[in-house]
Amino acid sequence: MRLESVAKFHSPKSPMMSDSPRATASDSLSGTDVMAAMGMAQSQAGFGMAAFCGKHELSQNDKQKAINYLMQFAHKVSGKYRGVAKLEGNTKAKVLQVLATFAYADYCRSAATPGARCRDCHGTGRAVDIAKTELWGRVVEKECGRCKGVGYSRMPASAAYRAVTMLIPNLTQPTWSRTVKPLYDALVVQCHKEESIADNILNAVTR
C-alpha cells in the first residue's frame, strides 16, 4: 500500500477499500487494516506521515505537526547556515518558524493549487517538442521546460525572504541568497525525503 492510497481512502468521492479480495494486496485491506497500517507508519515515520496527510488536507492537525517537525529539523541543522547560526535565540526561533512554514507550503503545492498550474503544460509536466515533431511528422513530447516536468510552479522564495526581513530588516537579498535561502531549500527537500521514507515504511508494513 502506498501513501497515495491513504489519500484515496480518506476521500469521500473514492470507493472505500473493503475486505473482498482484489487485484493487489492493498486493495484487499479493510478500513481497520488501513488505520492500523497508518498507525504503524506514523510510529516509525511521524514526520513523513504528518507532511503527507497535511499536504492532502486530511488533517489540519497534521499540517501543524509537520511544520513543528520541520522546525525541529531546522534547529538541528541551522548551525551549517551562517545567516541563521549567528542569530540570537528568540529571533532565530522566529526565523526558523517562518522558513519552516514557507518551506512546507512550497512542498504542499501541486498542479491543483490555485494559480500554481504551469501555463505551458497545463499541469501535465509534458510539452510538445516542436523541432522533433516537425522532423518526424508526429507529435513528440518532452519534459516541460517551464516547470521542469512537475506541472506547477514553486512558491517564490522571495515570499519567504520578505517574511524574514520583517524579523531581520537589514537582511539584503544577496546575503539571503548566500546564507539563508540554502536552509529554506533544504527544508523543502527534507519534506520530500520524509514523505518518501513514510511511503516505503507504509508499503513494507502492508505487504
From Swiss-Prot:
It comes from the Viruses. Changing residue 134 to K: Increased binding to QBE and increased suppressor activity. Residues 1-28 are annotated as: Disordered. The record marks 134 as: Interaction with host RNA polymerase sigma factor RPOD. Keywords: DNA-binding, Host-virus interaction, Metal-binding, Transcription, Transcription regulation, Transcription termination, Zinc, Zinc-finger. The keyword Flavoprotein does not apply. Mediates the switch from middle to viral late gene expression by associating with host RNA polymerase (RNAP) so that the latter can read without pausing and through transcription terminators preceding late genes. Competes with host factor sigma 70 for binding to RPOB, the beta-subunit of host RNAP. To join the elongation complex, binds a specific DNA Q-binding element (QBE) and interacts with RNAP that is paused during early elongation. Participates in the lysis-lysogeny decision by activating the expression of the late lytic genes. This is Antitermination protein Q.
